[in-house]
UniProtKB/Swiss-Prot annotation:
One of its GO terms (biological process) is negative regulation of smoothened signaling pathway. Acts as a negative regulator of hedgehog signaling probably by promoting internalization and subsequent degradation of smoothened protein (SMO) present in the ciliary membrane. Plays a role in sonic hedgehog (SHH)-induced spinal neural progenitor cells differentiation. The chain crosses the membrane at residues 7-29, 68-88, 101-121, 139-159. The keyword Transmembrane applies. Keywords: Cell membrane, Cell projection, Differentiation, Membrane, Transmembrane, Transmembrane helix. This is Modulator of smoothened protein. It is a multi-pass membrane protein.
Length: 167
């Protein structure tokens, strides 16, 4: 196993972890206000009302966000399989070729999720329009983690494809 394969495996693992963390954390969209702060995630929605304890419930997701969640889960599975194949490539060199294609599929799934997610900004909890959040609302840390997972996946693919050769 060469250095570029190890680097790409580490990048795919980091992307996988960031994508899992982005789903687990309910901060995809944040109203940002201290009084009645609302954070909306893909699996949880949390609200803090006037300094009380934070209350979290499972949201009723619009079809666009269900599709986003589905694509992210498939992307996570793809990256997990890719990491496994890169470990196997230590003994069977041809596994690297399959790992690259599966990682590419994961990147496409993540990019599709990133394109579809903003279409759901119209829901009542957010109050925006597709691809346009209201002024008092921002994307949260979970969305940033998800974008980082896309970035690490793309850079990992560059290393796996030996596009980023040193020197």
């Amino acid at each position: 196993m060469d250095k570029l394969t190890i680097i790409s495996g580490c990048l795919f693992l980091a992307a996988d972890i960031f994508a899992i963390a982005s789903i687990a954390n309910p901060d995809w969209i944040n109203t940002g206000g201290q009084e009645g702060a609302l954070t909306v995630g893909l699996v949880k929605q949390c609200q803090t009302i006037h300094g009380r304890n934070r209350i979290c419930v499972s949201p009723s997701l619009p079809p666009e966000w269900v599709t986003t969640l589905f694509f992210i889960i498939l992307g996570i599975v793809s990256l997990t399989i890719t990491c496994g194949l890169l470990v196997i490539s230590h003994w069977r060199r041809e596994a690297t070729k399959y790992a690259r294609w599966i990682a590419f599929m994961g990147m496409v799934l993540f990019c599709m999720a990133a394109l579809i997610f903003p279409v759901g900004f119209y829901i009542n909890q957010v109050g925006g329009q597709p691809y346009k959040l209201p002024n008092n609302t921002v994307v949260g840390s979970s969305y940033v983690l998800f974008v980082l997972s896309i970035f690490f996946t793309i850079v990992g693919l560059l290393f796996a494809g030996k596009v980023c050769l040193p020197g």
